[in-house]
Regions:
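Alpha-helical bundle segments that constitute or directly flank the non-heme di-iron/ferroxidase center
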Residues: 21-26, 40-70
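Amphipathic, well-ordered alpha-helical segments in soluble domains
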Residues: 28-29, 56-63, 90-94, 118-121
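Active-site-proximal alpha-helical scaffolds that flank and shape metal-associated catalytic sites
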Residues: 75-124
């Protein structure tokens, strides 16, 4: 049986998380996150989130692809390429499939305007 360990087995992570308790609570207990979790987020907001998350995931996949190029060992290349594979062939594909059911094709996803918040996050 799986049990929840807020430290993920790391004393350092546990100390960092304890030190950031209030910001962590604001982050993980945000109304948007809560509404996704309990299914009360407005449908339109969820679709908007999926489009923006697609944009984010594309940037994230590119960053990991760059890690493949910059890797110094085969093991590093394998790790980074497996993450690129998971993102591009599974997680992003899920977004494409769900958005297609909403009438949003992948070309539209790929050319979607990036929200300011997303832009700020992906370019920091």
């Amino acid at each position: 049986m799986l049990t929840y360990d807020p430290t993920y087995g790391s004393a350092v992570y546990g100390a960092w998380r304890a030190a950031a308790r209030e910001p962590w609570q604001r982050y993980t207990r945000h109304a948007f996150v809560e509404r996704i979790a309990d299914g009360t987020l407005a449908h339109r907001s969820f679709v908007y989130y999926l489009v923006q998350d697609y944009v984010f995931l594309m940037h994230y996949a590119r960053a990991w692809a760059l890690a493949v190029v910059k890797a110094e060992t085969r093991e590093e290349m394998q790790l980074a390429s497996s993450i690129v594979n998971g993102l591009t062939n599974h997680e992003i594909q899920l977004h494409v499939s769900v958005c297609a059911k909403e009438g949003i094709c992948e070309d539209e996803l790929f050319s979607a305007d990036e929200a300011f918040e997303n832009l700020a996050y992906t370019r920091y």
